[in-house]
């Protein structure tokens, strides 16, 4: 029979997880709290479990996928990370993003919207068709962008709609 540390290590190697997820996993394997807590503390000491770093890495992952802040936070809560760690990671991200203006939430939302327009194949003359606007709203909302960002993105697209460079626009 495998030891608790072997089972926990196998779980972490299979896919990264939070301390809370690992705790639940080990409880489901019928280990006691007396066995689980020292193991989790030792894994934290070795750096195998770091919930704050997991939050930081997941924020980067979510941004690469084009997700907004709300979606990233929802996904982190689903992975049972503490609100405190999530807030700290986003605060750090905000401090670091002041130097990196290109990767703002507004720019990511605009990139997602432009991708939808390109994929639609619709002719855009002076205004984006209502059907396409609604598709953009639904996609940005499902990606976790706030309504203010969604509608500012639509305004930006309306400004760009008459331009020939709309399809060539790069963020």
Regions inferred by a protein language model and the residue ranges of each:
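An alpha-helical, amphipathic repeat domain used for nucleic-acid recognition
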Residues: 1-171
